């Protein structure tokens, strides 16, 4: 691996920093084919496989017209990278803030194999004017 795990994760997040990526396949290239993404730990089951993750993000794009990320802090320990961010979603005519911590685990080849996001789903649901069940349903492909 010529780049550090932190550099790989920063580049991955940068693809989503200002808006939805124009080329989702290129943005998801750092993910291993069998990677998993857990949108809300522990409330939601992980989405397994790059193709399924892409389908979930495409589903989100239909509901969230725009999004961006503000990176607050990054720390790495070996192949594990921790990020503290505030994500923003533009939906129903307004921006909604989503404070979260994400944990990424990379394999020895530098591919992201685990992507877990820890956040308060009730905060997100409230800002979107939804119940927790409605939020969960809206995230399911």
Identify the role of each PLM range.
Residues 2-30:
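Short acidic-aromatic low-complexity motifs
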Residues 25-78:
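A solvent-exposed, acidic/Ser-Thr-rich amphipathic alpha-helical stretch
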């Amino acid at each position: 691996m010529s780049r550090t795990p932190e550099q790989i994760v920063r580049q991955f997040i940068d693809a989503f920093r200002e808006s939805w990526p124009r080329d989702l396949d290129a943005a998801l290239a750092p993910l291993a084919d069998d990677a998993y993404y857990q949108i809300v730990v522990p409330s939601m089951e992980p989405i397994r496989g790059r193709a399924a993750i892409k389908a979930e993000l495409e589903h989100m794009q239909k509901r969230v017209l725009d999004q961006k990320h503000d990176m607050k802090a990054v720390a790495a320990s070996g192949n594990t990278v921790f990020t503290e961010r505030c994500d923003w979603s533009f939906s129903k005519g307004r921006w909604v803030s989503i404070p979260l911590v994400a944990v990424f685990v990379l394999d020895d080849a530098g591919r992201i194999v685990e992507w877990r996001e820890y956040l308060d789903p009730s905060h997100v649901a409230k800002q979107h004017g939804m119940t927790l069940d409605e939020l969960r349903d809206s995230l399911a492909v």
